Amino acid sequence: LCRSRKDNAWAEANPDEVQQEYLISDRHTARGTKLRIHLMDGFHTQQLKVNTLDDPKRWWEVIDRTTGEVVPTDKWFFDEPTGEVEIETVPYHEYTVSFLAFLIWDPVHMYNFLTNDWKDTPHQLTYDVRQPKTQAYVKEKLRRWCEANPHIDVVRFTTFFHQFTLTFDDQKREKFVEWFGYSASVSPYILEKFEKWAGYKFRPEFIVDQGYHNTMFRVPSKEFRDFIEFQQQEVCALAKEMVDIVHSYGKEAMMFLGDHWIGTEPY
């Protein structure tokens, strides 16, 4: 059973609960006192779409990478029609923009589509089972499935909730892959819960990590370790609810270890 995809009708009807990922732009050097950065340069627009539903000033971050300082929100704005962020800059300093994007093509399905050279298969959208509407819908759908399939005694969860980081570039090549990556386990809903749990304000930099995306070769920050702990607690609690539903119908539950496993890793 796939819990986070294979239901495009639901995802299309609830675009606010499509899964999201934190992205970081390339570094750009300012030649003067103004700089415009096109957010989706280098990313595949069939996989990712800039989140324009939630407030950029709340959830995005512009950083002067020359000094390491965060650029105040009154010194930049998002020009939605062009997809660019305009920044008031110091000449010859480098800048990046960290921003939220919707995963409008499931990364695993995109990988299979490209690897197998599928032609006419519809792209599978994602949806975030952690969020209220989708969570209620998926639980009820699981109950209906169990009732409709009494002859099946073992249920394998192919996916739980969050895909490891698998991001494609504008040439449909793998731009960044991290089997233990948490970059695609985010949303304002989740991050507000994290802030209450952790007791401090979330920053996109905790995830994008100067563009290293907290690869296994990096020493994780305290904030990222906090985020991992929070995600594992939340994901495992919700996964248990799904397993309990399966058990309530007298069925055995097992999990496929491999893609949407973030928050359930056994090691």
Region roles according to the model:
Residues 1-267:
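Glycan-processing catalytic domains of CAZymes
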